[in-house]
A protein has these predicted regions:
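Vicinal oxygen chelate
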Residues: 86-146, 150-191
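A cross-kingdom feature marking solvent-exposed beta-strand/loop segments within repeated
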Residues: 30-36, 42-45, 66-71, 75, ...
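Extracellular structured ligand-interaction cores
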Residues: 48, 55, 70-72, 135
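Conserved beta-strand in the GNAT
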Residues: 57-62, 115
Length: 191
């Protein structure tokens, strides 16, 4: 996990927003300025690291896999699309978890979740930075590219083919020969 975080910060120029975790039973977060050696000495146990650059927000978490897997894809939606996407999830009887009005997760039953955000001021600020960096393509290695693409496309009402979904200006492509369940990060194209 530390190597993945280091790649985003060192090679791709992302900024560390915060590392969230625990010291003993106490939940805590550390912003940039605390190195891993400092955190290790404090007994810090990482839950997730949040990174940001331009209009891209990446959250990395420790996992049991050698290569990164994707738990969820996050989307900022306008109010109408947010409501319509939740309605489509309800029709499909998918599990929806709302977290205090800040974000909503939808389990897709296709090995990944969607994190949906209705309009928010902080999101507008993040998206306004798209001239600095935005995600043009995301390739995910998957066990069933067709299922994953159709699930994402249908839930978001986005155009899709057998392995590719066009979400706004971003292409999400599911490539074959991936692990069962959660897709594996295969490639990203930032512009």
């Amino acid at each position: 996990m530390r190597e993945v975080e280091a790649r985003y910060i060192g090679k791709l120029g992302f900024t560390l927003v915060a590392r969230h975790g625990r010291i003993g039973e106490e939940t805590t977060a550390f912003e940039a300025g605390y190195g891993w050696d400092d955190l290790d000495r404090m007994g810090f146990k990482l839950r997730l690291s949040e990174l940001e650059r331009g209009a891209v927000n990446v959250v990395v978490q420790p996992g049991q896999w050698e290569l990164p897997r994707v738990d969820h894809l996050g989307f900022a939606l306008d109010e109408d699309d947010f409501v319509a996407t939740l309605a489509r999830a309800e029709v499909r009887e998918l599990r929806v978890q709302e977290h205090g009005g800040r974000r909503t997760f939808v389990s897709t039953n296709a090995g990944f979740r969607l994190e949906l955000h209705p309009p928010r001021d902080w999101l507008d600020d993040l998206l306004a930075s798209s001239s600095e960096l935005q995600l043009a393509e995301l390739h995910l290695r998957a066990d069933d590219p067709e299922l994953k693409a159709s699930t994402l496309g249908e839930l978001l009402a986005a155009p899709y083919t057998e392995d590719t979904v066009m979400v706004g200006e971003t292409i999400v492509r599911f490539v074959p020969d991936g692990p069962q369940g959660r897709p594996q990060l295969h490639a990203e194209l930032f512009v």
